[in-house]
Structures are given as C-alpha cells and as structure tokens.
C-alpha cells in the first residue's frame, strides 16, 4: 500500500528489516504518531480494534484476529489484551517471519507484554524528528559520528531561529502538519483533553479531579529539559491549595502518562565502562512532543521569541528548554536507527551537565550539548572536554547542536552542527 501523502520515517527501514526476520513485531508510541500509517504500508490484512464491530468479533475469539493474508496488522491491540497471548501462541506454533504487526497507543497495566519477551519484538515510534520534517537535507550523520574517526563536519543551513521555533509549536504529529494558527491550537487542545478525559479512564484510572491532571501536566511541561524532582512538580501543580494531594494520589498520573508515552523522560546515563563519581540519577523531563509542552504553557512562536520565561519549576527562557526538547526527540529517533541508547549526564549539585549521551552497544559514547544560538564559545564546550578527559578513548566524538548557519569543527575537536544539518 502506497500513500502519496505519507511522510517517510527513519523507522521505516528498521521496521522492514525486522519484519523480514521475525514473526511478530509491535510498534509502540503515543496516539497520532503515525504507527498505523507506517505499519499499514507493509500489511496484507488489517484488523482495527478501535472499530467496535471488529473488536466484538475478536473478543469472541482472539484467534480470528490472526486470520488472513500475512503480515496481519492488529491496530490498537491493547484494547483487547488477550490478543497478545494469541500472537505469542501462534509464534510458538511456528509462525514464519513477517506474520504479525501489532500497533498500540498504551501499555496495558498487567504484565502481559513481559511474557512475550523473545517472541514479539518491540519498536518505539516517536513524533517526527527534525530530519523527517523535510526542512533541509542533512550533511552530518549521527551514525557516522557514533562510528568515530572524526568525520568531516561541513554544510550550511538556511533554517533560522524563527523556523526552529515554528517547528516547536507546529508539532511532530504527522496528522497536524498541514494545520496552523487556531486550527492547530484547537487540535492540540483536543489531544490534551482526550488524555485527561478519556485515555486515563480507558487505562482503568478513576479521575476524580480532571483539572488536577491538567495542572500536573502543565507543571511537568514547565520542567521540560530539567531534572526537577517529581515532588517539586507536584507542589507546582497544587500551589495555593491548603491541603495538597498526596504523592500516592499524583503518582498514578505519571505512571499512566508514561504508559501512554505522553511523558517521555531521558534517563540518567550510567556508564558501563569507566565509572564517573558523583553522577546523579534523576531523569530529564520531556513530553512526547515539545508542541504539547508549548500548548500546555500557552506559548506561541511570538512569545517564545520574545523571551517568555519558564514557569516554576523551570527556569530561564522557555524557548531554550523547548529547543533542547526538539533536539532530544530528534537524536533519540536517529540513535534508535543506529542501535544506540540515549541518556543525559549530571553530577550531584549540577556542576557538570551534558544534555545528551548517545551510547553504543559497546559502551562508547557520543556526547552532545544543545545550544540555542549560533555562536559557540569555550564555555559551551567545557563539560564536553571534561568528559573527554575523564573517559578519554571511550568518547567517540563531541558535538554542540545549535541553531546557527554552519557546521564545522572547532580547533579543540568539538563538532558544531545546526540541528537542521543532523540526520540519522
């Protein structure tokens, strides 16, 4: 199946490669990220469990969902969790490569998916990276940087700061790419409202105070690109209340929002080779799409460019935090294609911080700082050079991702790359 309106995804090649080799594969990610569209292009039979009539048939006999020409795509499989066991049994019974594709917008609350380990391969899909938005052809490959050898860094970008900010608020959800202005804001508001009013309920949560969930999301958005404690986020969400909800009340919000892939924190990096003393372990906060954070905070491209400050528990200009979130989203997409993991580094007290650490399977790393602006000075690279001194040969390269016009290497070896010029 080919769709002329389809936006090619970095994950497409990975999906096709795995489908040729494994019998069952599940594609996970938030609603609207493009899972169904990517999977449907490879499927011969499609079962949509968000259609009541199809769900009723499958609920009567889960094995009926597996019938038909293969690959069989089972969309929104989590609406009837026994499907997972049916697929697992089919794999155990000898289903060949490329038999089943499952797509889901949530992780069920039970341990069903854990029992599929080794039988059903899982792939994560995120909103569009900057490369996938087709603003400019990249000149630098993240995979090449991970390969080491100091690849040549060159290229010029005509993507301006205004263009980057427009992309932050425009969203990486494929279905929203043609929208702007009021229509886009309305769709993003509707997306957020559905999370609070419907998705949490479908996940089995009784939401007694929907406004508190919305306020928690808003406080989390204000903490974008920080390691603010969840206690501080809870306090910010409930400021002004005489009696604050307990941690036990608010923790389920976070857990379910992570299972819906709306909350998408970057974990702390734990070195697998050289130990580094005094590393802290809190995650760095990000929502699935920085446009969701902007909408929750009422930010527009104009207010971001005017220097709007992040609300507590964030600090500093909001545009910097959201640009880092856009960069983190993009790097995570590219790193997955390169079979690498992404974390962040922060020592206790915050005296050393590196925004993104991309780790290869062998434990060697690519260290990345994110800088809003084009001019990169010695202060911007000091933590990168510190890490290089600390673990030496285990750093394959160091990078500053910027909004500047040119990609180049500094005399100290740090690569300066506009985000628009970085691709997979």
Regions found by a protein language model. Give the residues of each.
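N-terminal pre-Walker A segment at the start of P-loop NTPase domains
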Residues: 1-16
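Hydrophobic anchor at the beta1->P-loop junction of P-loop NTPases
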Residues: 27
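Conserved lysine of the Walker
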Residues: 35
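Hydrophobic positions on the alpha1 helix immediately C-terminal to the Walker A/P-loop
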Residues: 38
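Conserved nucleotide-sensing/catalytic segment adjacent to the nucleotide-binding pocket
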Residues: 59-101
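Interdomain motor-coupling "hinge/lid" segment immediately C-terminal to the ATP-binding subdomain
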Residues: 105, 110-226
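Accessory nucleic acid-recognition modules appended to NTPase machines
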Residues: 181-364
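Domain-level recognition of nuclease-like catalytic cores that cleave nucleotide substrates
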Residues: 403-424
């Amino acid at each position: 199946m080919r769709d002329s309106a389809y936006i090619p995804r970095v994950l497409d090649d990975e999906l096709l490669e795995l489908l040729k080799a494994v019998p069952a594969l599940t594609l996970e990610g938030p609603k609207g990220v493009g899972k169904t569209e990517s999977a449907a292009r490879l499927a011969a039979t499609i079962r949509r469990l968000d259609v009541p009539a199809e769900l009723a048939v499958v609920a009567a006999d889960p094995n009926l969902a597996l019938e038909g020409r293969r690959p069989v795509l089972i969309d929104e499989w989590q609406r009837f969790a026994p499907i997972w066991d049916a697929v697992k049994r089919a794999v155990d019974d000898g289903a060949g490569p490329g038999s089943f594709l499952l797509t889901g917008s949530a992780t069920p609350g039970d341990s069903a998916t854990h029992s599929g380990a080794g039988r059903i391969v899982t792939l994560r899909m995120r909103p569009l990276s900057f490369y996938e938005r087709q603003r400019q052809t990249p000149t630098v490959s993240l995979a090449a940087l991970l390969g080491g050898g100091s690849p040549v860094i060159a290229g010029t970008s005509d993507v301006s700061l205004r263009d980057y900010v427009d992309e932050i608020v425009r969203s990486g959800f494929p279905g929203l790419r043609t929208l702007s202005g009021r229509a886009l804001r309305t769709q993003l508001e509707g997306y957020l409202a559905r999370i609070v009013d419907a998705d949490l309920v479908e996940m089995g949560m009784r939401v007694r105070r929907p406004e508190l969930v919305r306020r928690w999301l808003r406080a989390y958005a204000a903490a974008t690109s920080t390691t603010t404690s969840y206690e501080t986020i809870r306090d910010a969400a409930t400021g002004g209340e005489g009696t604050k909800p307990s941690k036990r009340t608010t923790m389920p919000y976070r857990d379910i929002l992570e299972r819906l892939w709306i909350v998408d924190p970057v974990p702390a990096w734990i070195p697998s080779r050289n130990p580094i003393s005094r590393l802290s372990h809190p995650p760095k906060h990000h929502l699935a799409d920085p446009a969701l954070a902007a909408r929750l905070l009422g930010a527009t491209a104009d207010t971001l460019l005017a220097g709007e400050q992040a609300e507590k528990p964030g600090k500093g200009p909001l545009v910097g935090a959201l640009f880092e979130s856009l960069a983190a989203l993009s790097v995570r997409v590219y790193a997955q294609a390169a079979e690498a993991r992404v974390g962040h580094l922060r020592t206790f007290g915050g005296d050393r911080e590196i925004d993104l650490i991309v780790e290869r399977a062998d434990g060697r790393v690519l260290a990345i700082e994110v800088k809003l602006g084009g001019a990169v000075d010695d202060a911007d690279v000091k933590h990168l050079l510190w890490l290089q001194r600390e673990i030496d040969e285990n750093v394959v390269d160091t990078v500053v991702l910027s909004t500047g016009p040119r990609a180049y290497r500094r005399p100290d070896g740090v690569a300066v790359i506009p985000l628009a010029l970085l691709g997979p």
